Amino acid sequence: MDVSGEPTVCSNAYANEMKLSDSKDIYVLAHPVTKKTRKRPRGLPLGVKLDPPTFKLNNMSHHYDTETFTPVSSQLDSVEVFSKFNISPEWYDLLSDELKEPYAKGIFLEYNRLLNSGEEILPSTGDIFAWTRFCGPQSIRVVIIGQDPYPTAGHAHGLAFSVKRGITPPSSLKNIFAALMESYPNMTPPTHGCLESWARQGVLLLNTTLTVRRGTPGSHVYLGWGRLVQRVLQRLCENRTGLVFMLWGAHAQKTTQPNSRCHLVLTHAHPSPLSRVPFRNCRHFVQANEYFTRKGEPEIDWSVI
């Protein structure tokens, strides 16, 4: 039956036998005959040229589903990027070549477009790479992987899980502190959620997505920050040994797979209150220090000061 409600009739050219359905007024093909189809010619007609390719942004929000952009073709000035985003010069050797890659150019192009359109992006431009400013690649000792920045204004400042002083620690950070106090019961309880004291000791607090639209978690996953972060982690793994990786949740564990013969790789459920496994029992902070002690290296002071 067609969309008008009339019975669908098939000619004898396409069937050898017609049967009427018992339950509906529809003619059913009992022995359909296959039609011969003409193959479409391959390639473009002579003289036809296509415009330069554009890429559709499959954003999680419908607001950007119709937006397109063309990849940057001009050479990206790494010095300019380092200056604009306040990236520490200590990271130049590790990041400069990667920032010239076409995908990285696309990230910054789209980031600028969003800013110019009036979108409120967190954290501020100067804090997106704040994780580079507390220690250089050769000083990294512990790597903790997060997902994307807190989407609430005033919270995110470029360090995974950390919030600015004066901000009430979010639930995930409270669970991290609970595990910390379980491991070190004599430690002074944290009075704020700023983890800069960890970062200064070589704890890399790195989100896999470096920006977010205010109020919309996961909104900037499509930009491609994850690829840049994976390259950073890959180079750290290749150039260093003896690092401690704390991979909390499936997302972090899929982001990087360090060689356990060269590094200490610790896994646990995410500290989110929605996790089925309580984070309070996570002993990663103690295990990291035990690892450093065996190597004759100083421990990390996990106090939040």
Curated annotation (Swiss-Prot):
SUPFAM superfamilies: Uracil-DNA glycosylase-like (SSF52141)
Keywords: DNA damage, DNA repair, Host nucleus, Hydrolase
Swiss-Prot/TrEMBL catalytic activity: Hydrolyzes single-stranded DNA or mismatched double-stranded DNA and polynucleotides, releasing free uracil
GO cellular component: a single term: host cell nucleus
GO molecular function, one term: uracil DNA N-glycosylase activity
One GO process term, biological-process aspect: base-excision repair, AP site formation via deaminated base removal
Entry EC number(s): 3.2.2.27
Active site: D148
Gene3D superfamilies: Uracil-DNA glycosylase-like domain
Main localisation: host cell
Primary enzyme class: hydrolase
UniProt-annotated location(s): Host nucleus
InterPro entries linked to this entry: UDG_fam1, Ura-DNA_Glyclase_AS, Uracil-DNA_glycosylase-like, Uracil-DNA_glycosylase-like_sf
Pfam families: UDG
Entry function: Excises uracil residues from the DNA which can arise as a result of misincorporation of dUMP residues by DNA polymerase or deamination of cytosines. Therefore may reduce deleterious uracil incorporation into the viral genome, particularly in terminally differentiated cells which lack DNA repair enzymes.
Family: Belongs to the uracil-DNA glycosylase (UDG) superfamily. UNG family.
Protein name: Uracil-DNA glycosylase
Organism of derivation: Varicella-zoster virus (strain Dumas) (HHV-3)
